[in-house]
């Protein structure tokens, strides 16, 4: 019917049972079951910023939901101003609000502006006490309970994760031993196609366990929270993505199960599930209607691409594209973009009632103790008592003033009898000053069955970068048709594809004379196979003039180059071209061609600009997360680690003539005092290299490592040739 409106994965067990000390934690954005529901009781019905039921307030704002774990509150936000601005994770005592520690980390090689830093929420791992964060620039970090770095990955350099002006970043989640994130990536080889890609990492080591790209062409970056549910024995991760599709994949393997296309734009709201009914929402263009926005219920037990017969009901014209819904028995509540909250029947989609809360809405409501806790972007925080016939406002408080409100963009967290939430100015804790454990944990999976037939072979780590002569150890896990772990397999048959070296019993030894190469390590168990991809980079120096490559191809090991750069014949030789074709997601691009742990090196390249409709493109070289860029239209030479934050950019005029080759040179050096020096020069090809550096920056918050690369912004085509990368002398 249609209405219209104007696992814990180890060898021995799959998921660990939650202990009572863990049971009151709110360790992820959407809570213990990732559905915005808390089972706690005796929660506050009113409070006041002036003091009533205010346990504490801390002067730290944010735009993402705080999490609570082991009596600590963790918040991700921005720190510092201007050239010293960074992203950070903060830890507070949950009883007092005392700041315990903070860890700051750099933003680099990203188009995200400063005011959108701290978009994602951190996630806590109840088994280890560790905390994980995905920054707006693509840095993925694992921190101990005390804020010490365990491991760090650069997803932009390693996988081509796209970060844009919108800042939208998906919050990570934990499932057993896996840390799972997603986003738009343009990687290399088998993963080069631009897509919304799900990626799982070993939470203890940071090794890549699986990658999955079940969708089509992405429209824009998104931040929809995933939910993991058991549907007829299959543990599904369900999430809206950047291709306008809601995808259901097996949580422990990434194998696609079903998908449903609902929009011509990316999806930012979370899915909620009641039995085998999944409720999906958005506020953008529809596929089957000219109206904007919809709510739709689909059969979550279906397989493949969902069709009309898999749709239980749909409501067109409801524009709830930021706030996620929450289920309350046989009804659910949802807030549209204009801060109108409505109740709908789960079974039919019939709207039961509607109430206005403000004018702008981003935060998702939390259902706890029969009440809804939610803030609005207008600075009002509500405690509501919903029913089948309407909603009672138990309490509403204005934070800041109506003229100058404290904006509330993030959702609340419920833990130990208290409500935690953040505005753009403060972190609040309301409720009892002393806590009590009353919540329950999510459902627990049973033990694996080692005798079930295997339908999926998982080779891990599934992505590695090595040097010639290196040795790597791979392992194999088997899963059944439901995506459940069976056992770790020691008797797989191993083989190599396009790699020089040897492999036996899971141990791969790269040929010492193999040079630059890429391929896969394959494991077969019975008639089922799986593989891991490997890139092998020889020691510096490197040179590349593209002459050995076929025209209309992409350098095979380059990250974030497909559909953005292409090899072309030009004046009797080969060059690399930053093309102008494609969407806005393709026009600006940073391509990487080496490991992200390189340091103390120099990058050189020839560049040449063209003009089109009186526009001239931009070109740059990248070393250790610094970019030396010539801007065509503005005729400037810039040295910058994070282009939108202009206080750290060094700039000088530079006359860049079109249709003329220039040589660019960027050197980055880690200094003994802990700072980093980046310096560059540019000169016309055929002229002598200038003795002096033209531009320099000493960075007080240095990037101490990073991949070599190039940058192109194709207002008109930009050419590259004769690349060199070598260690500093």
List PLM regions with ranges.
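Short, aromatic/His-centered strand-loop micro-motif at the edge of beta-sheets
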Residues: 643-665
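Extracellular glycan-recognition surfaces and repeat-rich motifs
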Residues: 48, 551-579, 583-587
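Noncatalytic, solvent-exposed loop/strand surfaces
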Residues: 22-458
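Flexible glycan-contacting loops in extracellular carbohydrate-active proteins
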Residues: 689-719
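Secretory/extracellular carbohydrate-interaction modules
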Residues: 571, 579-647, 728
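Short S/T/G/P-enriched beta-strand
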Residues: 437-473, 477-481, 531-541
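Short tryptophan-centered beta-strand motifs in secreted/extracellular beta-sheet-rich domains
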Residues: 546, 603-605, 659-672, 678-682
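Extracellular carbohydrate-recognition regions
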Residues: 24-28, 533-561
């Amino acid at each position: 019917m249609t209405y219209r409106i104007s696992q814990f994965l180890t060898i021995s067990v799959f998921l660990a049972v939650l202990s009572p000390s863990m049971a009151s934690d709110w360790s992820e954005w959407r809570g213990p079951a990732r559905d915005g529901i808390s089972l706690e009781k005796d929660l506050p019905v009113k409070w006041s910023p002036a003091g009533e039921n205010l346990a504490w307030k801390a002067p730290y704002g944010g735009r993402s939901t705080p999490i609570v774990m082991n009596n600590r509150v963790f918040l991700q936000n921005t720190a510092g101003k201007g050239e010293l601005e960074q992203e950070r994770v903060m830890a507070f005592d949950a009883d007092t609000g005392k700041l315990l520690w903070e860890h700051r980390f750099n933003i680099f090689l990203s188009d995200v502006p400063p005011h959108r830093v701290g978009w994602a929420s951190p996630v806590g791992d109840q088994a280890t006490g560790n905390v994980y964060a995905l920054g707006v620039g693509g840095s993925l970090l694992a921190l101990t309970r005390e804020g010490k770095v365990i491991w760090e990955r650069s997803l932009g350099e390693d996988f081509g994760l796209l970060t844009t002006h919108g800042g939208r970043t998906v919050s990570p989640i934990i499932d057993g031993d896996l840390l799972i994130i997603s986003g738009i990536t343009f990687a290399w080889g088998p993963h080069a196609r631009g897509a919304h890609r799900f990626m799982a990492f070993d939470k203890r080591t940071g090794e890549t366990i699986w990658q999955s790209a079940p969708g089509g062409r992405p429209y824009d970056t998104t931040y929809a929270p995933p939910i993991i549910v058991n549907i007829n024995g299959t543990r599904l991760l369900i999430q809206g993505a950047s291709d306008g599709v809601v995808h259901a994949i097996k949580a422990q393997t990434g194998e696609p199960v079903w998908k449903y296309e609902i929009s011509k734009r990316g999806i930012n709201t979370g899915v909620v599930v009641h039995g085998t009914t999944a409720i999906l929402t958005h506020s953008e263009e529809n596929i089957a209607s000219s109206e904007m926005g919809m709510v739709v219920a689909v059969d979550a037990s279906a397989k493949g691409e969902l069709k009309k017969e898999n749709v239980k009901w749909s409501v067109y014209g409801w524009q709830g594209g930021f706030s996620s819904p929450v289920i309350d028995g046989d009804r659910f509540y949802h807030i549209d973009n204009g801060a109108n909250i409505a109740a709908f029947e789960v079974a039919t989609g019939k709207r039961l009632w509607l109430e206005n809360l403000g004018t702008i809405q981003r935060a998702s409501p939390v259902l706890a103790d029969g009440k809804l806790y939610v803030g609005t972007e207008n600075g009002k925080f509500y405690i509501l008592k919903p029913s089948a016939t309407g909603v009672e406002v138990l309490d509403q408080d204005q934070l800041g003033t109506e003229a100058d409100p404290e904006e509330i963009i993030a959702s609340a967290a419920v833990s130990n009898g208290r409500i935690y939430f953040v505005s753009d100015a403060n972190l609040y804790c309301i409720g009892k000053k002393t806590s009590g454990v009353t919540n329950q944990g999510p459902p627990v999976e049973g033990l694996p069955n080692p005798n079930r037939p295997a339908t999926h072979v998982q080779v891990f780590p599934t992505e590695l970068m090595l040097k010639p002569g290196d040795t790597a150890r791979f392992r194999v896990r088997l899963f059944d048709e439901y995506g459940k772990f069976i056992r770790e397999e020691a008797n797989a048959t191993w083989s190599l594809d396009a790699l020089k070296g040897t492999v036996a019993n899971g141990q791969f030894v790269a040929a010492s004379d193999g040079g630059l190469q890429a391929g896969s390590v394959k494991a077969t168990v019975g008639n089922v196979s799986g593989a891991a991809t490997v890139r092998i980079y020889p020691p510096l120096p490197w040179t590349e003039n593209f002459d050995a490559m076929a025209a209309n191809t992409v350098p095979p090991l380059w990250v974030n180059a497909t559909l953005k750069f292409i090899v072309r014949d030009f004046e009797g030789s080969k060059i690399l071209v930053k093309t102008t074709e494609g969407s806005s997601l393709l026009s600006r691009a940073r391509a990487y061609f080496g490991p992200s742990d390189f340091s103390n090196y120099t990058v050189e390249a020839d560049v040449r600009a063209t003009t089109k409709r009186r526009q001239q493109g931009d070109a740059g070289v990248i070393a250790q997360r610094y970019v030396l860029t010539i801007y065509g239209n503005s005729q400037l030479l810039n040295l910058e680690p994070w282009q939108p934050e202009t206080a750290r950019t060094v700039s000088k005029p530079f006359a860049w003539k079109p249709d003329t080759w220039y040589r660019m040179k960027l050197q980055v050096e880690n200094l003994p005092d802990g700072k980093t020096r980046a310096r560059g020069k540019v000169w016309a090809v055929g002229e002598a290299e200038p003795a002096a550096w033209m531009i320099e920056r000493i960075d007080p918050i240095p990037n101490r490592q990073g991949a070599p690369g190039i940058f192109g912004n194709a207002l008109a085509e930009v050419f590259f040739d004769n690349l060199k990368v070598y260690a500093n002398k």
